[in-house]
Amino acid sequence: MAWNLAIITLVGKDGTKLEATLRRENRGLMCLGNGWKDLSISNGLKSGKSFTLELILENGTPMLSLVSTQSTSHKSQKRECSKHSEKESISAVPSKGKKNRKARSNREERRDSSSAIQNRFVTFTPEDIRDCILILPSQFIKANGINNLGEITLLGQNRMKWFAYLLSMSKDGSLALGSGWKGICEANGVNTGEAFTLEYIDEQETAHGRAQVCFYGVFPGKSVRSFASLRSKWNDLFYDFLREQNLRVNPIIGVAICLCKHHYCNYNSCSLFKPRPKLSQKNLNS
């Protein structure tokens, strides 16, 4: 549907002026109506040839001036103008609907070609941390086929390994990382309140007779030497660390109680650790 807005003057190559109707379609396109065919005929324009109109001002009045012609060979433009033509208008720009469909198609193609790559990455913000555990979105879990709960492997920037536990959180498929994720953040320089990204790696390692899921942190790495000893079992180095942090020994929680204090949890409300003035040698050996 279209309606006339005004009359505009068309100027030929020889300066001849013709009037044409300026029409606006309901999609917002501006079109030339009656009059433009006379300009085409008088200036030798034929079907299949493109032409350019320049907007000029003459005494403050806008006009469209024919400035150039250029031959084209589009087979789809072989139709001649006739008196019985259903439409006597030509759009000044391509159809908006066609442009939108083409743009949408291009976006879908790009999304399909890169979806496999995008699904491997998940970015975490402080809002994804609840009660000292890290929530993994269900979309990320489903896209990568992560189905088994239990121990998984986290890989740092320098390929050092941390072990964490995958826990079930809700019926919508969301899972969470328990103890272990704080260590990789601490060692790779992720500070409190900073977002960080993990990449899923389709690499299966066999440990304890079962496959593990591997992740890779895409943030800058730092020295992990001070935390390397924490990956070992309960030993003197681990107890030394607990003593320095003024924490109780909790064999169920393990490493999480140490790393929790540094950045990622509220010290007063987190249930994963309890401060104590000093650990006696008797308690350490118990």
From Swiss-Prot:
- What SUPFAM superfamilies would the database entry show? DNA-binding pseudobarrel domain (SSF101936)
Transmembrane intervals: none
**DNA-binding region location:** 1-70, 119-219
Keywords from the named record: DNA-binding, Nucleus, Repeat, Transcription, Transcription regulation
- UniProt GO MF annotations: DNA binding
Q: Matching InterPro entries, A to Z?
A: B3_DNA-bd, DNA-bd_pseudobarrel_sf, REM_fam
Q: Which domain of life is it from?
A: Eukaryota
Q: Name one GO cellular component term.
A: nucleus
Where does the UniProt annotation locate this protein? Nucleus
Principal subcellular localisation of the protein: nucleus
Q: Where is this region: Disordered?
A: 68-114
Q: State the PANTHER family in the record.
A: B3 DOMAIN-CONTAINING PROTEIN REM-LIKE 1-RELATED, B3 DOMAIN-CONTAINING PROTEIN REM-LIKE 3-RELATED
Name the chain's protein: B3 domain-containing protein REM11
Q: Which organism is it from?
A: Arabidopsis thaliana
